[in-house]
Amino acid sequence: MGIRPEEISSVLAEKIKNFDFSVETQEIGYVIQSGDGIARIYGLDNAVYGEMVEFESGVVGMVLNLEEDTVGVVVLGDPEKVKEGDVVKRTGRIMEVPVGKGLLGRVVNPLGEPIDGKGPIEYEGKRPIESPAPPIVRRQPVNTPLQTGILAIDSMIPIGRGQRELIIGDRQTGKTAIAVDTIINQKDKGVYCIYVAIGQKASTVASVVNTLEKYGAMEYTTVVAATASESAALQYIAPYAGCAMGEHFMYQGKDVLVVYDDLSKHAVAYRTLSLLLRRPPGREAYPGDVFYLHSRLLERSARLSDEYGGGSLTALPIVETQAGDISAYIPTNVISITDGQIYLESELFYSGIRPAINVGLSVSRVGGAAQIKAMKKVAGRLRLELSQYRELQVFARFGTDLDKATLEVLRQGERIVEITKQPQYQPMAVEDQVIAIYTVMNRYVTDIEVSEVRPFVMGLLKFLDEAYPEIKQSIRDTKDLTKETEEKLKAAILEYKEKYAAKGEK
Protein backbone atom coordinates (compact mmCIF):
# COMPACT_ATOMS: atom_id res chain seq x y z
CA MET A 1 0.00 0.00 0.00
CA GLY A 2 1.59 3.29 -1.05
CA ILE A 3 1.73 6.40 1.12
CA ARG A 4 1.15 9.67 -0.62
CA PRO A 5 3.85 12.32 0.09
CA GLU A 6 1.26 15.00 1.07
CA GLU A 7 -0.04 12.63 3.84
CA ILE A 8 3.44 12.33 5.32
CA SER A 9 3.85 16.09 5.54
CA SER A 10 0.41 16.54 7.18
CA VAL A 11 1.14 13.79 9.78
CA LEU A 12 4.53 15.36 10.56
CA ALA A 13 2.97 18.81 10.83
CA GLU A 14 0.36 17.44 13.28
CA LYS A 15 3.04 15.71 15.39
CA ILE A 16 5.17 18.87 15.52
CA LYS A 17 2.12 20.97 16.43
CA ASN A 18 1.24 18.72 19.38
CA PHE A 19 4.81 18.30 20.64
CA ASP A 20 5.31 19.57 24.21
CA PHE A 21 8.33 21.89 24.10
CA SER A 22 8.06 22.93 27.80
CA VAL A 23 11.17 22.17 29.81
CA GLU A 24 11.12 21.66 33.57
CA THR A 25 14.09 23.39 35.13
CA GLN A 26 15.27 22.92 38.68
CA GLU A 27 17.91 24.95 40.38
CA ILE A 28 20.23 22.68 42.34
CA GLY A 29 23.27 23.16 44.51
CA TYR A 30 25.74 20.98 46.39
CA VAL A 31 26.56 20.71 50.09
CA ILE A 32 30.19 21.78 50.53
CA GLN A 33 30.21 21.69 54.33
CA SER A 34 27.86 20.26 56.97
CA GLY A 35 28.03 20.26 60.75
CA ASP A 36 26.24 21.46 63.92
CA GLY A 37 22.92 21.54 62.06
CA ILE A 38 24.24 24.06 59.49
CA ALA A 39 24.92 23.26 55.82
CA ARG A 40 26.86 25.51 53.43
CA ILE A 41 25.64 25.11 49.87
CA TYR A 42 27.27 26.12 46.61
CA GLY A 43 25.22 26.77 43.47
CA LEU A 44 21.88 28.14 44.72
CA ASP A 45 22.53 31.62 43.34
CA ASN A 46 18.87 32.71 43.29
CA ALA A 47 17.85 31.36 46.72
CA VAL A 48 15.74 33.72 48.85
CA TYR A 49 16.13 34.44 52.58
CA GLY A 50 13.76 32.17 54.53
CA GLU A 51 13.21 29.80 51.57
CA MET A 52 12.74 26.06 52.08
CA VAL A 53 15.30 23.83 50.37
CA GLU A 54 15.22 20.06 50.07
CA PHE A 55 18.21 17.75 50.48
CA GLU A 56 18.40 14.51 48.50
CA SER A 57 17.69 12.50 51.69
CA GLY A 58 14.27 14.24 51.94
CA VAL A 59 15.29 16.44 54.89
CA VAL A 60 14.27 20.10 54.57
CA GLY A 61 16.29 23.17 55.44
CA MET A 62 15.76 26.91 55.62
CA VAL A 63 17.99 29.56 54.05
CA LEU A 64 19.31 31.98 56.70
CA ASN A 65 22.57 33.30 55.23
CA LEU A 66 23.14 34.66 51.72
CA GLU A 67 26.87 34.99 51.03
CA GLU A 68 28.93 35.79 47.93
CA ASP A 69 29.52 32.21 46.76
CA THR A 70 27.53 30.07 49.19
CA VAL A 71 24.21 29.91 51.02
CA GLY A 72 23.98 29.10 54.76
CA VAL A 73 21.09 26.73 55.49
CA VAL A 74 19.81 25.50 58.86
CA VAL A 75 18.77 21.85 58.77
CA LEU A 76 15.22 21.22 60.07
CA GLY A 77 15.50 17.49 60.52
CA ASP A 78 18.13 14.85 61.21
CA PRO A 79 21.45 16.62 60.44
CA GLU A 80 23.20 13.23 60.12
CA LYS A 81 21.28 12.61 56.87
CA VAL A 82 22.97 15.65 55.28
CA LYS A 83 26.41 14.82 53.87
CA GLU A 84 29.04 16.72 51.96
CA GLY A 85 28.41 16.49 48.20
CA ASP A 86 24.63 15.95 48.56
CA VAL A 87 22.40 17.57 45.94
CA VAL A 88 20.09 20.33 47.25
CA LYS A 89 16.97 21.57 45.41
CA ARG A 90 15.19 24.91 45.74
CA THR A 91 11.47 24.63 46.44
CA GLY A 92 10.61 28.24 45.55
CA ARG A 93 8.46 28.41 48.71
CA ILE A 94 9.04 30.35 51.91
CA MET A 95 9.10 28.12 55.01
CA GLU A 96 5.46 27.22 55.75
CA VAL A 97 3.43 25.16 58.21
CA PRO A 98 0.05 23.37 58.03
CA VAL A 99 -2.93 25.23 59.56
CA GLY A 100 -6.58 24.56 60.36
CA LYS A 101 -8.98 23.07 62.91
CA GLY A 102 -7.41 19.64 62.46
CA LEU A 103 -4.54 20.85 64.65
CA LEU A 104 -6.80 21.46 67.67
CA GLY A 105 -6.31 18.88 70.40
CA ARG A 106 -2.96 17.81 68.96
CA VAL A 107 0.72 18.08 69.90
CA VAL A 108 2.90 18.92 66.89
CA ASN A 109 6.51 19.86 66.22
CA PRO A 110 7.36 23.27 64.67
CA LEU A 111 6.96 21.77 61.17
CA GLY A 112 3.34 20.85 61.98
CA GLU A 113 4.07 17.11 62.12
CA PRO A 114 2.16 15.21 64.85
CA ILE A 115 4.28 13.93 67.76
CA ASP A 116 1.46 12.65 70.00
CA GLY A 117 1.01 9.26 68.32
CA LYS A 118 -2.64 9.96 67.40
CA GLY A 119 -2.21 9.47 63.67
CA PRO A 120 -2.12 11.92 60.76
CA ILE A 121 -3.74 15.39 60.87
CA GLU A 122 -6.24 16.76 58.36
CA TYR A 123 -5.02 20.24 57.44
CA GLU A 124 -6.96 23.08 55.82
CA GLY A 125 -3.91 24.43 54.02
CA LYS A 126 -0.46 25.87 54.63
CA ARG A 127 0.71 29.29 55.75
CA PRO A 128 4.20 30.91 55.69
CA ILE A 129 5.72 31.08 59.18
CA GLU A 130 6.90 34.66 58.52
CA SER A 131 4.24 37.11 57.38
CA PRO A 132 3.95 40.88 57.75
CA ALA A 133 2.04 42.25 60.75
CA PRO A 134 -1.37 43.81 59.98
CA PRO A 135 -0.95 47.52 59.12
CA ILE A 136 -2.45 50.23 61.36
CA VAL A 137 -5.47 50.82 59.09
CA ARG A 138 -6.53 47.19 59.47
CA ARG A 139 -6.46 47.30 63.28
CA GLN A 140 -8.86 48.59 65.89
CA PRO A 141 -8.18 49.51 69.53
CA VAL A 142 -8.24 46.75 72.14
CA ASN A 143 -11.72 46.92 73.71
CA THR A 144 -12.82 43.37 74.58
CA PRO A 145 -11.48 41.63 77.69
CA LEU A 146 -9.64 38.31 77.63
CA GLN A 147 -10.52 36.89 81.05
CA THR A 148 -7.67 34.93 82.64
CA GLY A 149 -9.80 33.71 85.55
CA ILE A 150 -7.08 34.99 87.91
CA LEU A 151 -8.54 37.66 90.19
CA ALA A 152 -5.31 39.65 90.68
CA ILE A 153 -4.79 39.94 86.90
CA ASP A 154 -8.38 40.57 85.75
CA SER A 155 -8.85 43.30 88.38
CA MET A 156 -5.48 45.13 88.42
CA ILE A 157 -3.60 44.13 85.23
CA PRO A 158 -6.45 43.42 82.78
CA ILE A 159 -5.67 41.85 79.40
CA GLY A 160 -7.65 42.72 76.26
CA ARG A 161 -8.08 40.62 73.11
CA GLY A 162 -5.31 41.58 70.67
CA GLN A 163 -2.92 42.69 73.42
CA ARG A 164 0.64 41.48 74.08
CA GLU A 165 1.17 40.98 77.83
CA LEU A 166 4.56 39.75 79.04
CA ILE A 167 4.79 37.29 81.94
CA ILE A 168 8.21 37.80 83.52
CA GLY A 169 9.94 36.37 86.58
CA ASP A 170 12.65 34.05 87.88
CA ARG A 171 12.50 30.29 87.38
CA GLN A 172 9.93 28.46 89.52
CA THR A 173 7.71 31.48 90.22
CA GLY A 174 4.59 30.21 88.44
CA LYS A 175 4.90 31.79 84.97
CA THR A 176 3.68 28.73 83.05
CA ALA A 177 0.95 28.21 85.69
CA ILE A 178 -0.58 31.62 84.86
CA ALA A 179 -0.51 30.84 81.12
CA VAL A 180 -2.05 27.37 81.61
CA ASP A 181 -4.77 28.76 83.92
CA THR A 182 -5.60 31.37 81.26
CA ILE A 183 -5.94 28.63 78.61
CA ILE A 184 -8.20 26.56 80.93
CA ASN A 185 -10.37 29.65 81.55
CA GLN A 186 -11.09 30.05 77.79
CA LYS A 187 -13.38 26.98 77.87
CA ASP A 188 -16.74 27.84 76.22
CA LYS A 189 -15.54 31.38 75.42
CA GLY A 190 -14.84 30.74 71.72
CA VAL A 191 -11.10 31.40 71.97
CA TYR A 192 -8.65 29.05 70.22
CA CYS A 193 -5.39 28.59 72.15
CA ILE A 194 -1.88 27.75 70.98
CA TYR A 195 0.80 26.86 73.52
CA VAL A 196 4.34 27.04 72.10
CA ALA A 197 6.97 25.30 74.24
CA ILE A 198 10.50 26.43 73.34
CA GLY A 199 13.47 24.61 74.86
CA GLN A 200 11.38 23.08 77.69
CA LYS A 201 12.04 19.64 79.13
CA ALA A 202 9.91 17.00 77.37
CA SER A 203 8.56 15.94 80.80
CA THR A 204 7.37 19.52 81.48
CA VAL A 205 5.55 19.68 78.13
CA ALA A 206 3.95 16.26 78.79
CA SER A 207 2.78 17.53 82.20
CA VAL A 208 1.20 20.67 80.62
CA VAL A 209 -0.56 18.53 77.97
CA ASN A 210 -1.91 16.17 80.68
CA THR A 211 -3.21 19.14 82.69
CA LEU A 212 -4.94 20.63 79.62
CA GLU A 213 -6.52 17.25 78.82
CA LYS A 214 -7.66 16.79 82.43
CA TYR A 215 -9.52 20.12 82.42
CA GLY A 216 -10.98 19.64 78.92
CA ALA A 217 -8.89 22.43 77.39
CA MET A 218 -7.13 20.38 74.69
CA GLU A 219 -10.26 20.40 72.49
CA TYR A 220 -9.59 24.07 71.60
CA THR A 221 -5.79 24.05 72.04
CA THR A 222 -2.78 23.15 69.88
CA VAL A 223 0.57 22.47 71.54
CA VAL A 224 3.65 23.26 69.42
CA ALA A 225 6.62 21.60 71.11
CA ALA A 226 10.29 22.26 70.36
CA THR A 227 11.79 20.57 73.42
CA ALA A 228 15.31 20.99 74.77
CA SER A 229 16.44 17.91 72.82
CA GLU A 230 15.46 19.47 69.46
CA SER A 231 17.94 21.39 67.32
CA ALA A 232 18.39 25.14 67.75
CA ALA A 233 16.86 25.59 64.27
CA LEU A 234 13.55 23.98 65.30
CA GLN A 235 13.49 25.99 68.55
CA TYR A 236 14.08 29.14 66.48
CA ILE A 237 11.11 28.58 64.12
CA ALA A 238 8.69 27.29 66.82
CA PRO A 239 7.11 30.63 67.87
CA TYR A 240 6.73 31.77 64.24
CA ALA A 241 5.05 28.46 63.39
CA GLY A 242 2.67 28.79 66.38
CA CYS A 243 1.88 32.38 65.38
CA ALA A 244 1.09 31.32 61.78
CA MET A 245 -1.32 28.65 63.09
CA GLY A 246 -3.04 31.32 65.20
CA GLU A 247 -3.14 33.90 62.38
CA HIS A 248 -5.11 31.44 60.23
CA PHE A 249 -7.97 31.62 62.77
CA MET A 250 -7.54 35.38 63.34
CA TYR A 251 -8.05 36.14 59.63
CA GLN A 252 -11.24 34.02 59.75
CA GLY A 253 -12.63 36.43 62.38
CA LYS A 254 -11.92 34.20 65.38
CA ASP A 255 -10.21 35.07 68.69
CA VAL A 256 -6.88 33.38 69.40
CA LEU A 257 -4.54 33.22 72.39
CA VAL A 258 -0.88 32.28 71.80
CA VAL A 259 1.52 31.54 74.67
CA TYR A 260 5.27 31.63 73.92
CA ASP A 261 7.03 29.69 76.69
CA ASP A 262 9.62 31.07 76.73
CA LEU A 263 11.35 33.75 74.63
CA SER A 264 14.58 33.69 76.69
CA LYS A 265 15.31 30.19 75.39
CA HIS A 266 14.20 31.32 71.92
CA ALA A 267 16.82 34.11 71.97
CA VAL A 268 19.46 31.59 73.11
CA ALA A 269 18.55 29.27 70.19
CA TYR A 270 18.84 32.20 67.76
CA ARG A 271 22.19 33.20 69.29
CA THR A 272 23.43 29.63 68.76
CA LEU A 273 22.38 29.69 65.09
CA SER A 274 23.87 33.14 64.51
CA LEU A 275 27.24 32.20 65.98
CA LEU A 276 27.30 28.96 63.94
CA LEU A 277 26.51 31.04 60.83
CA ARG A 278 29.52 33.24 61.72
CA ARG A 279 27.48 36.39 62.29
CA PRO A 280 29.20 39.01 64.48
CA PRO A 281 28.13 38.86 68.16
CA GLY A 282 26.87 41.93 70.06
CA ARG A 283 25.78 42.54 73.66
CA GLU A 284 25.75 39.32 75.75
CA ALA A 285 26.93 37.59 72.51
CA TYR A 286 23.44 37.99 70.98
CA PRO A 287 23.42 39.09 67.32
CA GLY A 288 22.54 42.67 66.42
CA ASP A 289 19.02 41.84 65.22
CA VAL A 290 17.81 40.07 68.38
CA PHE A 291 15.35 42.92 69.05
CA TYR A 292 13.86 42.51 65.56
CA LEU A 293 13.68 38.74 66.20
CA HIS A 294 11.03 39.32 68.88
CA SER A 295 9.43 42.54 67.60
CA ARG A 296 8.45 41.02 64.24
CA LEU A 297 6.89 38.07 66.09
CA LEU A 298 4.92 40.07 68.68
CA GLU A 299 3.77 42.77 66.22
CA ARG A 300 1.69 40.09 64.49
CA SER A 301 -0.70 40.16 67.47
CA ALA A 302 -3.62 42.45 66.70
CA ARG A 303 -7.31 43.20 67.00
CA LEU A 304 -8.46 43.43 63.38
CA SER A 305 -11.03 46.04 62.37
CA ASP A 306 -14.57 44.83 61.63
CA GLU A 307 -14.22 45.13 57.83
CA TYR A 308 -11.35 42.61 58.04
CA GLY A 309 -13.35 40.15 60.14
CA GLY A 310 -12.75 41.57 63.63
CA GLY A 311 -10.59 38.61 64.68
CA SER A 312 -7.87 38.93 67.31
CA LEU A 313 -4.58 37.33 68.26
CA THR A 314 -3.51 37.85 71.88
CA ALA A 315 0.07 37.01 72.84
CA LEU A 316 1.35 35.99 76.27
CA PRO A 317 5.14 35.83 75.87
CA ILE A 318 7.08 34.49 78.87
CA VAL A 319 10.61 35.65 79.76
CA GLU A 320 12.78 34.17 82.50
CA THR A 321 14.95 36.52 84.57
CA GLN A 322 18.12 35.72 86.52
CA ALA A 323 17.94 36.75 90.21
CA GLY A 324 15.08 39.17 89.49
CA ASP A 325 17.12 41.29 87.08
CA ILE A 326 14.56 42.78 84.69
CA SER A 327 17.15 45.21 83.29
CA ALA A 328 19.04 42.48 81.37
CA TYR A 329 19.13 42.56 77.55
CA ILE A 330 16.26 40.22 76.55
CA PRO A 331 13.86 41.27 79.38
CA THR A 332 14.22 44.99 78.55
CA ASN A 333 13.78 44.27 74.83
CA VAL A 334 10.56 42.33 75.32
CA ILE A 335 9.20 44.78 77.95
CA SER A 336 9.60 47.60 75.41
CA ILE A 337 7.82 45.60 72.66
CA THR A 338 4.82 44.42 74.72
CA ASP A 339 1.77 46.32 76.04
CA GLY A 340 2.55 45.63 79.68
CA GLN A 341 4.00 42.98 81.96
CA ILE A 342 3.01 40.73 84.84
CA TYR A 343 6.04 40.57 87.14
CA LEU A 344 6.30 37.50 89.38
CA GLU A 345 8.55 37.59 92.45
CA SER A 346 10.30 34.70 94.22
CA GLU A 347 9.89 36.33 97.66
CA LEU A 348 6.12 36.54 97.30
CA PHE A 349 5.99 32.98 95.92
CA TYR A 350 7.89 31.52 98.88
CA SER A 351 5.85 33.54 101.39
CA GLY A 352 2.73 31.74 100.14
CA ILE A 353 1.25 34.54 98.02
CA ARG A 354 0.40 32.71 94.80
CA PRO A 355 0.10 33.84 92.02
CA ALA A 356 3.19 35.79 93.15
CA ILE A 357 2.37 39.02 91.28
CA ASN A 358 4.26 42.17 92.25
CA VAL A 359 1.48 44.71 91.66
CA GLY A 360 3.89 47.66 91.87
CA LEU A 361 6.03 46.53 88.92
CA SER A 362 3.21 44.96 86.88
CA VAL A 363 1.20 47.06 84.45
CA SER A 364 -1.24 46.70 81.55
CA ARG A 365 -0.89 49.60 79.15
CA VAL A 366 -4.00 49.02 77.03
CA GLY A 367 -6.11 46.48 78.95
CA GLY A 368 -7.94 49.06 81.08
CA ALA A 369 -10.14 49.97 78.10
CA ALA A 370 -11.19 46.32 77.84
CA GLN A 371 -12.36 45.88 81.45
CA ILE A 372 -16.08 45.39 82.04
CA LYS A 373 -17.93 48.22 83.84
CA ALA A 374 -18.63 46.16 86.96
CA MET A 375 -14.92 45.40 87.46
CA LYS A 376 -13.92 49.04 86.89
CA LYS A 377 -16.39 50.10 89.60
CA VAL A 378 -15.27 47.68 92.30
CA ALA A 379 -11.53 47.37 91.55
CA GLY A 380 -10.70 51.06 91.09
CA ARG A 381 -9.09 51.43 94.53
CA LEU A 382 -7.70 47.89 94.74
CA ARG A 383 -4.20 48.58 93.38
CA LEU A 384 -3.84 51.78 95.44
CA GLU A 385 -4.83 50.14 98.74
CA LEU A 386 -2.57 47.16 98.04
CA SER A 387 0.39 49.48 97.27
CA GLN A 388 -0.22 51.47 100.49
CA TYR A 389 -0.30 48.20 102.45
CA ARG A 390 3.02 47.00 100.95
CA GLU A 391 4.61 50.38 101.83
CA LEU A 392 3.41 50.37 105.45
CA GLN A 393 4.18 46.66 105.90
CA VAL A 394 7.89 47.56 106.18
CA PHE A 395 7.24 49.83 109.20
CA ALA A 396 4.99 47.23 110.82
CA ARG A 397 7.93 44.81 110.93
CA PHE A 398 9.80 47.08 113.32
CA GLY A 399 6.99 46.68 115.85
CA THR A 400 6.71 50.43 116.40
CA ASP A 401 3.53 51.96 117.81
CA LEU A 402 1.25 52.64 114.87
CA ASP A 403 -1.67 55.05 114.76
CA LYS A 404 -5.24 53.92 114.15
CA ALA A 405 -5.31 54.93 110.45
CA THR A 406 -2.12 52.95 109.70
CA LEU A 407 -3.46 49.89 111.50
CA GLU A 408 -6.67 50.19 109.45
CA VAL A 409 -4.64 50.22 106.17
CA LEU A 410 -2.67 47.16 107.34
CA ARG A 411 -5.81 45.26 108.38
CA GLN A 412 -7.49 45.99 105.04
CA GLY A 413 -4.30 45.16 103.09
CA GLU A 414 -4.01 41.73 104.72
CA ARG A 415 -7.57 40.94 103.65
CA ILE A 416 -7.00 42.13 100.08
CA VAL A 417 -3.91 39.90 99.84
CA GLU A 418 -6.04 36.95 101.01
CA ILE A 419 -8.56 37.28 98.16
CA THR A 420 -5.80 37.69 95.56
CA LYS A 421 -4.42 34.28 96.58
CA GLN A 422 -5.79 31.60 94.30
CA PRO A 423 -5.14 27.85 93.94
CA GLN A 424 -3.80 26.63 90.60
CA TYR A 425 -6.26 25.32 87.96
CA GLN A 426 -9.21 27.05 89.69
CA PRO A 427 -10.05 30.06 87.51
CA MET A 428 -12.85 32.33 88.78
CA ALA A 429 -15.72 33.60 86.65
CA VAL A 430 -15.68 37.38 86.27
CA GLU A 431 -18.95 37.82 88.22
CA ASP A 432 -17.43 35.87 91.15
CA GLN A 433 -14.36 38.12 91.04
CA VAL A 434 -16.55 41.26 91.12
CA ILE A 435 -18.49 40.00 94.16
CA ALA A 436 -15.31 38.89 96.00
CA ILE A 437 -13.62 42.28 95.47
CA TYR A 438 -16.82 44.19 96.35
CA THR A 439 -17.11 42.27 99.64
CA VAL A 440 -13.53 43.03 100.71
CA MET A 441 -13.30 46.62 99.40
CA ASN A 442 -16.53 47.60 101.20
CA ARG A 443 -15.11 46.40 104.53
CA TYR A 444 -17.53 43.48 105.02
CA VAL A 445 -14.68 41.21 106.17
CA THR A 446 -12.79 43.65 108.45
CA ASP A 447 -14.11 41.88 111.57
CA ILE A 448 -13.32 38.39 110.22
CA GLU A 449 -9.98 36.70 110.98
CA VAL A 450 -7.47 36.93 108.10
CA SER A 451 -7.25 33.13 107.80
CA GLU A 452 -11.07 33.00 107.49
CA VAL A 453 -11.40 35.63 104.72
CA ARG A 454 -11.00 33.26 101.76
CA PRO A 455 -13.32 30.53 103.15
CA PHE A 456 -15.89 33.29 103.94
CA VAL A 457 -15.80 34.71 100.39
CA MET A 458 -15.94 31.24 98.77
CA GLY A 459 -18.88 30.35 101.04
CA LEU A 460 -20.62 33.61 100.07
CA LEU A 461 -20.30 32.81 96.35
CA LYS A 462 -21.80 29.36 96.94
CA PHE A 463 -24.62 30.89 99.03
CA LEU A 464 -25.44 33.37 96.22
CA ASP A 465 -25.60 30.51 93.69
CA GLU A 466 -28.20 28.75 95.83
CA ALA A 467 -30.23 31.63 97.28
CA TYR A 468 -29.80 34.61 94.91
CA PRO A 469 -28.65 33.35 91.47
CA GLU A 470 -30.13 36.47 89.82
CA ILE A 471 -27.33 38.66 91.28
CA LYS A 472 -24.60 36.80 89.37
CA GLN A 473 -26.85 36.52 86.32
CA SER A 474 -27.36 40.30 86.27
CA ILE A 475 -23.59 41.00 86.40
CA ARG A 476 -23.00 38.37 83.70
CA ASP A 477 -25.66 39.77 81.36
CA THR A 478 -25.25 43.54 81.84
CA LYS A 479 -21.47 43.43 82.57
CA ASP A 480 -22.29 46.13 85.11
CA LEU A 481 -23.13 46.37 88.81
CA THR A 482 -26.41 48.29 88.69
CA LYS A 483 -27.83 50.15 91.72
CA GLU A 484 -30.58 47.54 92.05
CA THR A 485 -28.14 44.60 91.92
CA GLU A 486 -25.82 46.33 94.39
CA GLU A 487 -28.66 46.73 96.93
CA LYS A 488 -29.53 43.04 96.55
CA LEU A 489 -25.86 42.11 96.94
CA LYS A 490 -25.48 44.20 100.13
CA ALA A 491 -28.52 42.52 101.68
CA ALA A 492 -27.29 39.05 100.64
CA ILE A 493 -23.80 39.66 102.12
CA LEU A 494 -25.29 40.79 105.46
CA GLU A 495 -27.64 37.78 105.48
CA TYR A 496 -24.76 35.38 104.82
CA LYS A 497 -22.61 37.14 107.42
CA GLU A 498 -25.24 36.47 110.10
CA LYS A 499 -25.39 32.79 109.08
CA TYR A 500 -21.58 32.59 109.10
CA ALA A 501 -21.36 34.19 112.56
CA ALA A 502 -24.04 31.82 113.91
CA LYS A 503 -22.15 28.85 112.43
CA GLY A 504 -18.94 30.10 114.12
CA GLU A 505 -20.65 30.40 117.53
CA LYS A 506 -21.80 26.78 117.37
From Swiss-Prot:
Biased-composition ranges for Basic and acidic residues? 119-129
**InterPro entries assigned:** ATP_synth_asu-like_sf (IPR023366), ATP_synth_asu_C (IPR000793), ATP_synth_asu_C_sf (IPR038376), ATP_synth_F1_a_nt-bd_dom (IPR033732), ATP_synth_F1_asu (IPR005294), ATPase_a/bsu_AS (IPR020003), ATPase_F1/V1/A1_a/bsu_N (IPR004100), ATPase_F1/V1/A1_a/bsu_N_sf (IPR036121)
The keyword Ion transport belongs to this UniProt entry's keyword annotation: yes
EC number(s) on record? 7.1.2.2
Q: What is its main location?
A: membrane
Pfam families reported in the protein's UniProt record: ATP-synt_ab, ATP-synt_ab_C, ATP-synt_ab_N
Which parts of this chain are annotated as the region Disordered?
119-138
SUPFAM superfamilies to which the protein is assigned, alphabetical: C-terminal domain of alpha and beta subunits of F1 ATP synthase, N-terminal domain of alpha and beta subunits of F1 ATP synthase, P-loop containing nucleoside triphosphate hydrolases
Query: Which annotated residues bind ATP?
Result: G169, D170, R171, Q172, T173, G174, K175, T176
Q: How does it assemble?
A: F-type ATPases have 2 components, CF(1) - the catalytic core - and CF(0) - the membrane proton channel. CF(1) has five subunits: alpha(3), beta(3), gamma(1), delta(1), epsilon(1). CF(0) has three main subunits: a(1), b(2) and c(9-12). The alpha and beta chains form an alternating ring which encloses part of the gamma chain. CF(1) is attached to CF(0) by a central stalk formed by the gamma and epsilon chains, while a peripheral stalk is formed by the delta and b chains.
Q: Which NCBIfam families match?
A: atpA, PRK13343.1
Q: What is this protein called?
A: ATP synthase subunit alpha
**From what organism does this protein derive?**
Caldanaerobacter subterraneus subsp. tengcongensis (strain DSM 15242 / JCM 11007 / NBRC 100824 / MB4)
